[in-house]
From Swiss-Prot:
PANTHER family: UNDECAPRENYL-DIPHOSPHATASE. It is an enzyme of class 3 (hydrolase). The lineage of its organism: Bacteria, Bacillati, Actinomycetota, Actinomycetes, Frankiales. Catalyzes the dephosphorylation of undecaprenyl diphosphate (UPP). Confers resistance to bacitracin. This is Undecaprenyl-diphosphatase 3. It comes from Frankia alni (strain DSM 45986 / CECT 9034 / ACN14a). The gene is uppP3.
Length: 297
């Protein structure tokens, strides 16, 4: 990987990490279409340190408040009923499923899960699920001849059950093409949360798992380590990609939260389905192979 590739992939990572379109799928597809080597799961995980740093800075006041309340809840019983303390505990609870599955499925994540046929399929399927969840969230409750707005939850309503279900939804993002934010936001909408609450909790929930994964994969960068193509993944381009991902990721968070406050997820649904169908067409036509850029067995 050279510095130009690192810059482009960092830009892709930052622009797509927080949108429900799957950053890992876009990194894989971009490299395949450009004729580059597969950057690999380790590169993806490390560059996500940049985007999660953007989350830390963007939500710094919320995070500081949550951490403080969570810490106080260890010694002060009354704090255990505090919303921020509960969010802190449930973020940790929701991280357990993806942590366990990430370790168990590591070989699949770095190998079969990166098959472009699987990625195309998950782009389409999760896109349809997101569309259904968004439709459900906007659909009114029938009452006689009329329909009333469906009551929506906020983070104040977050329960242990919901926290665990959010965590299970996040686990699906181990497959490129699913999208961490897409899966957790869809889950949140189906559980009855507002778009804004589902998105905010999605970003907060991702931090422990993504940062831990990125730090864990640092050992796979540089030296004699290899990416998905069997070639060395160098430190220089990876650092550049991470910095670019941070800058573009911060802008993407701000834009996305403003966007969903007044609009639906329909454009993202259409984009996911169209991209998945295009990818399947390219694969069927032989323009690219399902394992393009991957290491040979």
């Amino acid at each position: 990987m050279n510095y130009f590739e690192g810059t482009v992939l960092g830009l892709v990572q930052g622009l797509t990490e927080f949108l429900p379109v799957s950053s890992s799928a876009h990194l894989r597809i971009t490299a395949a279409l450009a004729g580059w080597d597969d950057p690999g799961a380790a590169f993806t995980a490390v560059t996500q340190i940049g985007t999660e740093t953007a989350v830390l800075i963007y939500f710094r006041r919320d995070i500081a408040r949550i951490v403080r309340a969570w810490a106080l809840s260890w010694t002060r019983r009354e704090m255990r009923k505090d919303t921020d303390a509960r969010v802190g505990w449930l973020v940790l609870l929701g991280t357990i499923p993806i942590g366990l599955l990430g370790v168990t499925l590591q070989d699949a994540i770095e190998g079969p899960f990166r098959d472009l046929r699987l990625i195309a399929t998950t782009l389409i399927v999760l896109g349809l699920i997101l569309g259904g969840a968004d439709w459900y969230a906007s659909k009114g409750r029938p009452r006689g001849r009329h329909s009333l707005p469906r009551p929506r939850k906020t983070l104040r309503d977050l329960s242990v059950r919901d926290g665990l279900l959010y965590g299970l939804a996040q686990s699906a993002a181990l497959i490129p093409g699913v999208s961490r934010s897409g899966a957790t936001i869809s889950g949140g909408l189906l559980l009855g949360y507002t778009r804004e609450a589902a998105a905010r909790y999605s970003f907060l929930l991702a931090m422990p798992a993504v940062l831990a994964s990125g730090v864990f994969e640092l050992k796979s960068i540089g030296g004699d380590r290899e990416g998905g193509d069997g070639e060395e993944v160098s430190w220089g381009p990876t650092i550049v990609a991470t910095v670019v991902a941070f800058a573009t990721g911060y802008a993407a968070i701000a834009w996305f939260l403003r966007y969903i406050s007044t609009r639906s997820f329909a454009p993202f649904v259409l984009y996911r389905v169209a991209l998945g169908l295009l990818l399947l067409a390219l694969l069927a036509g032989g323009a690219i192979s399902a394992d393009a850029g991957a290491a040979a067995d």
